[in-house]
Every structure is written in C-alpha cells, then in structure tokens.
Amino acid sequence: IKVMKTLVIHPQDKSTDFLIPVYMNLGGFPDFEKPTIIRGGVSRDLIRELIKQHDRVIMLGHGSPSGLFSVGQFGQSGMIIDASMVEALSNKPNNIYIWCNADKFMEQHPTLQGFYSGMFISEVGEAAMYNIKASQEVINESNNLFANVVGNYIDLDQ
C-alpha cells in the first residue's frame, strides 16, 4: 500500500488563518500520513524540492492569476507559487489551489489538475470591490463554512 504524502503551503497571515481547518485534521488514515506544513521561512528551491517529494500539494492564502503570494514569509520574492513551479506541480491530480483567482492560474497552465477556487472574498473591502454588500461577520461565516466543508471531505475516496 502506497501512503499518500501531502505538502501544505500556507504562508503565515492572520487574514487567511480561517483556512487552517482545510488541512488541520489530515493524516491518521491508513493510506495518508500527517502532512508537511510550511507557513514560511524556507527558500523557493526547497519548496520546489518538497513539491517533487510529495504526492499532493495543498496551497492556500492570498494570490492572483499569477500565483500564490508569499506575503513576506519566503524571502524577497512576492510569490511562492508561480509559473516557475508549474512543472513540479504537474501530474499531481489531487492538488488543491485555494487563493483569489486560482482558477485563472489554472487556465494559464493546462498541465495542472486538482481542486481550485475562483475569487475568494476574505474581507469587506474585497466584497465592496465586487459590489457585494456583506458584513465581516457574514464573510467570516461563509469562509469558515467553506474551510470546514473542504476539510471534512478532502480525503474521501474520489
């Protein structure tokens, strides 16, 4: 039996901590080991090597169509996941991409597979940019529900 190895890349940022339930209960199944969780403090080269060593990569945080922002947690680069990581991420059908406009990143890189988000509203200012009237309380409730549902069903048989 092959054990699935999961890498989680979630740059340390209080405004995206609501996503922690997506991965906090991973592992413990006979066919899954506890994930490797990276929140910052490592080089892009090490991230690339870790991606290659794992069967599935879960990437979460702030981002754009160009990739996942490093939010100052991974040295000088503004991105931790971008086009330079696509080759390492390819051929991993169970990857998860959760950041604003991850769908646009996926469209630009057709070799990538997995579950991904579109625009993700995490604060009132983002909602206002899209003419959505919502309180921070409603946004938090929606985001917490999303993270808990994904976390509860992430390892179910496909």
What spans do the regions from the language model cover?
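Short, T/G/N/S-enriched strand-turn elements that build extracellular solenoid repeat scaffolds
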Residues: D45-L50, L68-F69, S84-E87, E107-Q108
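Short, well-ordered alpha-helix to beta-strand connector turns
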Residues: Q53-H54, K92-P93, T111
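General structural signal for secondary-structure boundaries
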Residues: R39-R44, Q76-M85, Q158
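A short, glycine/acidic-enriched catalytic loop
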Residues: S64-N91
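Short, glycine/charged-enriched secondary-structure capping and boundary segments
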Residues: V22-Y23, V71-F74, P110-L112
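A domain-level signal for caspase-like cysteine endopeptidase catalytic cores
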Residues: I1-I58, I96-I98
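Short acidic, S/G/P-rich loop/turn micro-motifs used as interaction or catalytic elements
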Residues: Q12-F18, V42-R44, H62-V71, N101-F105, ...
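Active-site-proximal C-terminal subdomain of hydrolase catalytic domains
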Residues: N95-Q158
